[in-house]
Every structure is written in structure tokens, then in C-alpha cells.
Amino acid sequence: MRIVLVGPPGAGKGTQAAFLAKNLGIPHISTGDLFRANISQQTELGKLAKSYMDEGNLVPDEVTIAMAKDRMEQPDAVNGFLLDGFPRNVKQAEALDEMLKSEGMKLDAVLDLEVPEDEVVKRIAGRRICRNDSAHVFHVSYKPPKQEGVCDVCGGELYQRDDDSEETVRRRLEVYHTQTEPIIDYYRAQGLVVTISALGPVEEVTQRAMDALKREDASK
């Protein structure tokens, strides 16, 4: 299957993408990973992207599209892929359609992970990170430390990142709605959008997504 994954920050896209890709036997293609790989390998596209990023500018659509195209042409993506973070706008969505059409292919589904806005804020704003090791992550509601403000693993101080403040999260949600809702509308007009609730345990959400994708696949 060829799938695009969308959902607000805090919806668990990265986690679900990894599980779904494994269950479906297709590669998980994340734009974040693509940028990091191209920059670390110093590819021409990576150098170009880095030049924009170093100046604090957004990487142009053309560069992102070229990176995605290059990755989707790899042998492991011949029979399908799960895109996470691409397309980010309608221009990129149109480019993806053209890309696939030129190869005689098309998308099978756009999986929309739905989470109420207040839950997104709760999920992200409740995160606490250890100052000694950022891999030690806690949550005031879902995974509280034994002692408030202290890491269970190493005793380091737990803090809230600036990016995780409620004000920042709500701003990120505004950007998401502005950028992504037009993409969802674009794909909905093609009958590709499959919306599921991303509330509940990770395994339940994965199963919900798998069931929805199977139904979508069977209906074609």
C-alpha cells in the first residue's frame, strides 16, 4: 500500500508509523529522517537543504519533493511506503500525485489520526525531560516520576522544554490547521481520507488503523 499519514503534533504519528510500516511490510519514510540522512551524507540535496536551514529559512518545496522522490525510487519502496511529514502542503501533494502518476501508480489511502486539541495540549505540555539525559522522558499524568521533578533513572532534574509549553503547542496547532487541513480537503475530494481516533493505548490505535486500512483496501 501507498499511504500518507497525517495528524496534529502529539498524535503519535512517529510511533504509529513505525508499527504500521512493520505490520504492512513497507518502509516508513519520514521527512525528518530524509533531511538528516541527506545532510549527514552530504548529498547535493542535503547541502542545498542545509544552506537554507543555516540561514534560518524554510527549505523550498522543490528540494523536499526531490528528496522524497529519490527515496520513493529506492527498491524497498517499489511495492509501497508510508509517508510521514510529506506532503506538507497542497503544492507538495500535487507533486506527489504527478510523481506517482508518471510511474503508473497512485496513493491508496491518507490516514488521518484524530486527537482533540485539548488532549494534544495535555500530551505535549505534560512532558518532562531529564536535564542529564534527554532519553529519560516522563509525563505529569501518564508517566509521572516517583518524586516530582526528579528523574527516576539518574536523579537528574526534570524540566519542560520551551517547545512543550501550552502557548507554543497551541501555536503549532494553528500552523498545523493552516497547512494541513487544505491537504486533507485535497485528498478527501479524491476519496482517499481514512480518519481514525488516535486516543487510547498505542496497540489499540495501531489495530484501529490496520482495520481501517484493510477496509479501505478491500473497497477498491
Swiss-Prot record:
List the catalytic activities from the record: AMP + ATP = 2 ADP
InterPro entries membership: Adenyl_kin_sub (IPR006259), Adenylat/UMP-CMP_kin (IPR000850), Adenylat_kinase_CS (IPR033690), Adenylate_kinase_lid-dom (IPR007862), P-loop_NTPase (IPR027417)
UniProt region (LID), positions on chain: 126-164
Which SUPFAM superfamilies does the entry link to? P-loop containing nucleoside triphosphate hydrolases
Q: So, what pathway does this thing act in?
A: Purine metabolism; AMP biosynthesis via salvage pathway; AMP from ADP: step 1/1
**Known Gene3D superfamilies for this protein?**
P-loop containing nucleotide triphosphate hydrolases
Where is AMP annotated to bind?
T31, R36, N57, L58, V59, G85, F86, P87, R88, Q92, R161, R172
Query: What terms describe the molecular function in GO for this protein?
Result: adenylate kinase activity; ATP binding
**Location(s) in or outside the cell:** Cytoplasm
One Pfam family linked to the record: ADK
Where are the residues of the annotated region NMP? 30-59
Q: What is its EC number?
A: 2.7.4.3
**Where along the chain is ATP bound?**
G10, A11, G12, K13, G14, T15, R127, V137, F138, G200
Q: Which GO terms describe its cellular component?
A: cytoplasm
User: What top-level branch of life does the organism fall under?
Assistant: Bacteria
Q: What's a GO biological-process term for it?
A: AMP salvage
Q: Which UniProt keywords apply?
A: ATP-binding, Cytoplasm, Kinase, Nucleotide biosynthesis, Nucleotide-binding, Transferase
Q: Which family does it belong to?
A: Belongs to the adenylate kinase family.
- HAMAP family linked to this entry: Adenylate_kinase_Adk
Q: Describe the protein's quaternary organization and the partners it interacts with.
A: Monomer.
Query: What note about domains is in the entry?
Result: Consists of three domains, a large central CORE domain and two small peripheral domains, NMPbind and LID, which undergo movements during catalysis. The LID domain closes over the site of phosphoryl transfer upon ATP binding. Assembling and dissambling the active center during each catalytic cycle provides an effective means to prevent ATP hydrolysis.
- Describe the function of this protein: Catalyzes the reversible transfer of the terminal phosphate group between ATP and AMP. Plays an important role in cellular energy homeostasis and in adenine nucleotide metabolism.
Report what the protein is called: Adenylate kinase
Q: Which organism is it from?
A: Streptomyces avermitilis (strain ATCC 31267 / DSM 46492 / JCM 5070 / NBRC 14893 / NCIMB 12804 / NRRL 8165 / MA-4680)
What gene name is given for the protein in this entry? adk
